[in-house]
Regions:
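Bacterial N-terminal signal peptides
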Residues: 3-12
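Domain-level marker for long, solvent-exposed, non-transmembrane regions
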Residues: 16-192
Length: 192
């Protein structure tokens, strides 16, 4: 009989107690408002530098696609900065489709850029800075491109000079053919 009284009493007392199962864990998560990026990504060019710069950053689950998209973004910015000086036709297209992180959310990223730049040789674009970091299940790439107007002008001047030499040769051969033709006419008139 004592057993019937003590067991319910012990059970009722144990129901009022709390069980601690290890150190307390806070459910609060803290998020930073700042995004980590390389220092050079936001640095302004030196005042005496006449070059034009473009930066880009992109994310992808695929390493190479992350790099390609970041280069495309930097070129797009570079071209838009350059377009205030002139106008080239450049079409860029990038598509990514996939699962982000471990969730089931699908992301389709589609970008089309069309910048009109006519008769401009954009040779001389250099990748000045480059960095890839692991971010979640993918990769984030940061790129900084530099386009030196001075170097570009040297290249264009060399191309113009080469074309001028070719044009001079063409004119000289054309003039010689005309002279030869005129000489033949005179010879034919003397014979008739």
């Amino acid at each position: 009989l004592l057993c019937y009284i003590i067991i319910p009493f012990v059970i009722s007392l144990s129901a009022c107690s709390t069980i601690k199962d290890g150190p307390s864990v806070s459910e609060t998560k803290y998020f930073s408002n700042e995004v980590d990026y390389p220092k050079w990504y936001a640095d302004a060019p030196k005042k005496d530098d006449s070059a034009i710069y473009g930066v880009g950053t992109e994310y992808s689950n695929d390493f190479q696609f992350s790099v390609d998209k970041a280069m495309l973004s930097a070129k797009r910015e570079l071209a838009s900065n350059y377009s205030s000086y002139t106008s080239a036709m450049m079409k860029d297209f990038a598509v990514e489709s996939g699962v982000l992180g471990k969730g089931v959310a699908n992301a389709d990223i589609e970008r089309t850029t069309r910048l009109i730049v006519a008769k401009v040789n954009l040779v001389g674009v250099q990748r000045q800075n480059f960095m890839v970091v692991k971010e979640g299940s993918g990769f984030r790439t940061f790129v900084r491109l530099r386009f030196s107007a001075d170097e570009s002008n040297k290249i264009m001047l060399a191309e113009i000079q080469r074309n001028a030499a070719l044009y001079a040769q063409l004119r000289a051969s054309k003039s010689f053919r005309e002279l030869d033709k005129q000489t033949n006419k005179i010879e034919e008139q003397k014979i008739s």
